[in-house]
Amino acid sequence: TIIVDSTVACRPKRNEILEVDIQPDNVIVGFSSYGQATYENAYNAGMGSNGLTSGRHDLLHHSYHAKYPESFDINTDEEYIYSGQFSLTDSLEGTPVDIGKALLSPTRTYAPILNKIMQDTALKGAINGIIHCTGGAQTKVVKFLDKPLHIIKDSLLETPPLYKTIHETTGTSMKEMYEVFN
């Protein structure tokens, strides 16, 4: 597996930093990781980089094991290596893309949206935190609490077709799905 990654660093002014200060009765606003944003040129299935390994091994057929032996850790139990039923070119139900394109959807960047929000002084002043769910998915918010609060997410976005397919074909519990996938 070849991973192409990048890191961006910046040195903003202290007064430009949005401190996380989550309060009781705050409202959580979520952005979808799938579909096609106005600033994207194609459908995005919502697969973030943290879910890619699990997603491809959960969905892709075991024949990829022999065909691409360099694409997995040889120390992994074989039962977990490409244990799915799909080929890369199989259609992903409910989307305009195939399984391969869905798995390779780039991690969505929310920079265009956040840039507009941060330029609006009134909006920026009403925000008590911005949390990107990569690396913890729907449970990541609890890592940013500095006081005992109970987080209630009772109006989640519709489950993306790619995640529905993973859930239905693997039997992975929804609890685990919400802990792993964005």
Language-model-derived ranges and their functions:
Residues 1-182:
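Helix-biased detector of long, well-ordered alpha-helical tracts
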